[in-house]
Amino acid sequence: MADKGSVAAKSLTNSAPLSIFSYCAASILMTVTNKYAVSGVDFNFNFFLLAVQGIVCITLISSLKQLNVITFREFNKVEAKKWFPIAVLLVVMIYTSSKALQYLSIPIYTIFKNLTIILIAYGEVIWFGGRVTNLALGSFVLMVLSSAVASYGDSNVDTGKLNFNIGYFWMFTNCFSSAAFVLFMRKRIKLTNFKDFDTMYYNNLLSIPILLFASLTTEDWSAKNIAQNFPEDTKYAVIASMIISGMSAVGISYTSAWCVRVTSSTTYSMVGALNKLPIALSGLLFFKAPINFYSISSIFIGFAAGLVYAIAKQKQKKEDELQLPTDKS
C-alpha cells in the first residue's frame, strides 16, 4: 500500500497538466483575493495589507523549509545589505500595484500590466545587450493597441471617471517600478546566484519592516478608520483574502518552478501568456467590471499580444542557441 501511495504521489508531482492548472489557479486566486481586499469603500490600508501578505509568505516558506519541502539560504547581513535596494523597489512596485488594482478593474489592470514587458525588453537592450526582434516588436504594438482599446472602452462607461484616471496614474507608475525592480533584481541575482525561494525570502523579510513603518506613519489607525476598512459584515472575509493572497504568492513561485521542471520553459512561457485570458475574465466574473465590445476586444488583443511575445521569445532563444557553436569556431 505504501509503495502504491508513493507511486501515486510521484505520478502527481510529475503531472504536467496538474502543474499547469495549479500555476493558473494560484495566479487567478492571488489577483482575485487582492482585488477583493482593496475593493472596500475608501480602503486605505494598502501598506498594512502588503505587510500582512509578506508576513504570511515568510511564515509559510519558513514552515515549508522546516518540513524539508523547500530550501533557501539562511539570513546573511552582508547579502541583506546588498539586497535592500531591491526590497525598496519591491515595496514601490507592490504598493502601486495594489493602488492600481484598487481603482481599475481586473481586465484593465491585466491588459496594462503587459506594458511592463515592453519596458523590461528595452531595459535589457540597454543594460544586458539584449535585442528586440520584429516578432517581439509586433507583440508590443498589440500590447499598446489592447491598452488603448481597453482605455477607450472604460471611458465610455459611466463608472466614475476620476477614479479611473487615478487608477491609470498608479498603473503607469507600477509599470515603470515593476520594470526597474525586475531589471535591478536580475543584475543582483547574477552577482549573488540566488534561487527562487532565496529571492522570495529576502524580498519579503526586508520589505516587511518598510511596509509596517509606512503603515504606522502614513495610514490612519484611528478606531473609526479601522472600522471603515474592516466593516463588521465583511471584516473576516477581508482578513481571509489578505492571508490567502499571501499564501498564493508562495503558490505562484512553487508552481512556476514545478511547471518548468515537469514541462519546459517553452510550455511555461506559453502558459504565462495564455493565463492572461482567465485572469482578465475572472474580473468580469467576480467583480462588476465594464462589459462592452471594447473591453472584450481588448482582453483578446492583449491575450494575442502575450501569445505572440511568448512565441517571439522562444524563437529568439532557439536562434541564439544555434549561433553559439558558430561563435566558438
Curated annotation (Swiss-Prot):
Q: Where in the cell is it found?
A: Golgi apparatus membrane; Cytoplasmic vesicle membrane; Endoplasmic reticulum membrane
GO biological process terms, alphabetically, are: transmembrane transport
* Transmembrane stretches, start-end: 12-32, 41-61, 84-104, 108-128, 132-152, 164-184, 197-217, 238-258, 267-287, 291-311
| Statement: the UniProt record of this protein carries the keyword Transmembrane | yes
What InterPro entries does the database record attribute to this sequence? SCL35B1-4/HUT1 (IPR013657), TPT_transporter (IPR050186)
- What keywords sit in the KW lines? Cytoplasmic vesicle, Endoplasmic reticulum, Golgi apparatus, Membrane, Sugar transport, Transmembrane, Transmembrane helix, Transport
Q: Which residues lie on this side of the membrane: Lumenal?
A: 33-40, 105-107, 153-163, 218-237, 288-290
**Membrane topology type:** Multi-pass membrane protein
Cytoplasmic side: which ranges?
1-11, 62-83, 129-131, 185-196, 259-266, 312-329
User: Which GO terms of the cellular component aspect does the record hold?
Assistant: cytoplasmic vesicle membrane; endoplasmic reticulum membrane; Golgi membrane
Q: Write down the superkingdom of origin.
A: Eukaryota
> One Pfam family for this entry, by name?
UAA
PANTHER family named among the record's database cross-references: SOLUTE CARRIER FAMILY 35
User: NCBIfam families from the xrefs?
Assistant: nst
Q: What protein family does this chain belong to?
A: Belongs to the TPT transporter family. SLC35D subfamily.
User: Subunit composition?
Assistant: Homooligomer.
According to its UniProt entry, the function of this protein is described as: Involved in the import of GDP-mannose from the cytoplasm into the Golgi lumen.
- Quote the protein name from its UniProt record: GDP-mannose transporter
State the organism of origin: Komagataella pastoris
Q: What taxonomic classification does the UniProt entry list for its organism?
A: Eukaryota, Fungi, Dikarya, Ascomycota, Saccharomycotina
